Amino acid sequence: MSNKKADSKPQAKYPVNLLDTPFPMRGDLPKREPQWVKEWEERGIYEKIRAASKGRPKFILHDGPPYANGDIHLGHAVNKILKDIVVKSRNMAGFDAPYVPGWDCHGMPIEIQIEKQFGKSLPAAEVMSKARAYATEQIEKQKVGFKRLGVLGDWANPYKTMNFVNEAEEIRALGKIIEKGYVYRGLKPVNWCFDCGSALAEAEVEYKDRTDPTIDVMFAFAEPEKTAHAFGLPALPRAEGGIVIWTTTPWTIPANQALNLHPEIIYALVDTERGLLIIAQERVEACMADFKLTGRVVATAPGVKLANLRFHHPLASAHPGYKRTAPVYLGDYVTTDTGTGVVHSSPAYGIEDFMSCKAHGMTDSDIINPVMGDGRYIESLPLFGGLSIWDANPKVVDALNAAGSLLRSEKYTHSYMHCWRHKTPIIYRATSQWFAGMDVTPQDGGKTLRETALEGIDATAFYPSWGKQRLFSMIANRPDWTLSRQRQWGVPMAFFVHKETGELHPRTLELLEEVAKRVEQSGIEAWQSLDPRELIGDDANLYEKNRDTLDVWFDSGTTHWHVLRGSHKDQLQFPADLYLEGSDQHRGWFHSSLLTASMIDGRAPYKGLLTHGFTVDGEGRKMSKSLGNGIDPHEVANRLGAEIIRLWIASTDYSGELAISEEILKRVTEGYRRIRNTLRFLLANLSDFDFAQHAVPVDEWLEIDRYAVAFSQQLQTELLGHYEKYEFHPVVAKLQTYCSEDLGGFYLDVLKDRLYTSAADSRARRSAQTALYHLTHGLLRVLAPFLSFTAEEAWKVFQPASDTIFTETYYAYPEVAGSAALIEKWALLRDVRGNVTKALEEARTANRIGSSLQAEVAVHASGARYDALTSLGDDLKFVLITSAATVVKVDDEAQESVDVAASKYQKCERCWHYREDVGAHADHPTLCGRCFSNLFENGEIRSAA
């Protein structure tokens, strides 16, 4: 399409090739983007990408499912857009890279919403139906938000963990790990939330500061003679006293059952005003100061010598219910960093305490566990029955003081575990749960789960690389995985358990498959309504249905099984090439997926893990409601455009925190405009170019055109290397430099004279347009993964017959002979041009010239620069954008310089060059010779620029 402008008389008289384009200067993104979203959906663009990619090697980015609750936030936008960039860049690299989005649907947050709306007394069947409806509604809302961000995917057929087939396959996955021997039932302290009334996964725990009473408590001597002997004394100097512990959880004292010392720490027997006190020797001075006592060390002994001594419970004198003794056990976990070097053990409320007591022969039935699931003590607990443990804290302190056992009490602020949903403090609480054993030897006698998972980490590529050590440390040190939860809205652990022994039914694997078949037809509701007699007949008198549900991290952690090889196996495959999530997922989805795949398949479910950071404001502060520094992606999209969010994400190093503010968005918008203006220039100057009709063969191009294509091809190779490694911010940085400096600041700047003033169909102009055609092909494709709306908009102008840019692959530039030498030569020329531009600016500042075309320059150059400059001949002036340019040879670099002089000639009305031949043709007194030739004769001859 040709649109020659004729806005003024000179242009009408002596026209130049100023063309227009339907690609507007202003993006008007908030208005146009929703139109593209609608068009992509109506025209089935995602399906067309799949059709175009069919038969290519697969690349699978498996979507970590967001939770189906609430509006999408900026963190969602970061995650989904990064995934979109990966998928689009892999498709354009020649892969078949489908994107199946998914949602995590079961679990506490939705159950809480249902309880809030309808109360806690709903029948189970109603909880299920309302939870499904709620999750569906939330998914549809989030789906709209993700589409608005320009994310292409199979939105019509996402995976949902609540779909019947996924629920059924999850039960089958449970059967797999039971069959392999990883699952056991036992009493163990687990993270317990009183508000949830359930165990929590490690990933559901967050830490916040909390102020609690900290107390030092004395356990009185129960075996004075043995104690004296342990310290090498014939007898204790006095009867009063005991061993001293320090704790920040007074509420655990009623459940104390043991004391722990380190075998190698030296303990001192200190004579004080409160009697003889046993404290770690290196803590004596600090403790005496804290207790406001004076003390003399009577004797010392290593912890190992004190093993098995017994001491009275500190509340023994307060109530007969506490008349018991606590034995001394040895534990390597005891330190002298704080406290007394003695740890009191309530095995029901601490993992190390529990393991220590069990190792010393304590059985499950021996363990005292007076705290109920709602956080209250059992009614029968002496002194504190029925109290909340938090309300009991000060009362325990008072009782210890009254019993003469309290040495010190203070307020103490420490980092403490909280439920991520309720933001309330949680505890470790021993409950009977189902576990996946990290160090259990499986049925086949192979490696343990921990060993297999660590090997899986070694075989995985990490982006950035530091993620590897982080996940490795978590797996190496984690406890057994608590699989069970005590809720309704979740996939059931569909076991039949013996009413007396607690053993699983001998046909458990077969029964799980029968349940899975029913769930596949009717959902998890099928288990809720199942009469045990249907499956186990008369055994129903001996066995009961297990009421536990699976940890929701098992839901999402088995998507490699029930999605990649289940509901979406025709599109996806196992293992996935990439999992991509925020850095919190090292203890979340990355973690649970690794454990389940290690149990089921003996390998990791992914070949690569990509981790991104969290969003912060411009000052590096975490976004929060209290600070009022949150940024809503919907608001930004509606005000500036989703493209600006996409460009911000792509241009930020996601391996750290992603800073965003209005000032940052302003800079991103300015960068976007520069790219858009470059595209507009390219499209406008190609609007009268038909490649089939006007293309010039490569070997006939002008030299600068060959350079521009060779340079662009070299840049594309670099960019594709970055895309391959998921390094997006260097892609954006290099493309912005390319648009503003390599194109806008150099090549396109030089090209304007030839494009505008050469004869419309001349070889010189068509050579430039042929190069621009290739550059536009290449540029739009490398922009498309992140500037998706803009690349598509420009593509429809550039290639109107094509359905979409997203079915294209990266551009195959024509080969330019001697490209390396050409790039090297023009790097020298651009360097010289920079010096000339600086000299011209100085002359302009001194009012010696106006525009650069008013100048004539003499470039003094040596060596390779001299050779490069002289090789351009008379075309050098076009490269320097001056009316005349000469080259003067000098001996060395020290003598190089640029002389600038104002031209003494007249300015051509058409090309604005100052030339001696302006007015040489009497009929055209304001026209220079080359413009006359370009308009009325065969046109000027150019070879280089």
UniProtKB/Swiss-Prot annotation:
An example molecular function term from Gene Ontology annotations: isoleucine-tRNA ligase activity
Protease as UniProt keyword: no
EC number(s) recorded for this UniProt protein: 6.1.1.5
Motif ('KMSKS' region): 622-626
Amino acids binding ATP: K625
UniProt keywords, alphabetically: Aminoacyl-tRNA synthetase, ATP-binding, Cytoplasm, Ligase, Metal-binding, Nucleotide-binding, Protein biosynthesis, Zinc
Keyword match Cell membrane: no
List of residues binding Zn(2+): C908, C911, C928, C931
Subcellular location field: Cytoplasm
Disulfide linkage: none
GO cellular component terms attached to this protein's record: cytosol
Residues that bind L-isoleucyl-5'-AMP: E581
Motif 'HIGH' region per UniProt: ranges: 66-76
Cofactor(s) demanded: Zn(2+)
UniProt cross-references to Gene3D superfamilies, sorted A to Z: 1.10.730.20, HUPs, Valyl/Leucyl/Isoleucyl-tRNA synthetase, editing domain
Cofactor note: Binds 1 zinc ion per subunit.
Source taxon at top rank: Bacteria
Family annotation (Pfam families): Anticodon_1, tRNA-synt_1, zf-FPG_IleRS
A GO BP annotation: isoleucyl-tRNA aminoacylation
Coiled coil start-end: none
Self-association state and partner proteins as the record states: Monomer.
Family affiliation: Belongs to the class-I aminoacyl-tRNA synthetase family. IleS type 1 subfamily.
PANTHER family for the chain: ISOLEUCINE--TRNA LIGASE, MITOCHONDRIAL, SOLEUCYL-TRNA SYNTHETASE
Job of this protein: Catalyzes the attachment of isoleucine to tRNA(Ile). As IleRS can inadvertently accommodate and process structurally similar amino acids such as valine, to avoid such errors it has two additional distinct tRNA(Ile)-dependent editing activities. One activity is designated as 'pretransfer' editing and involves the hydrolysis of activated Val-AMP. The other activity is designated 'posttransfer' editing and involves deacylation of mischarged Val-tRNA(Ile).
Protein name as it appears in the record: Isoleucine--tRNA ligase
Provenance organism: Burkholderia orbicola (strain MC0-3)
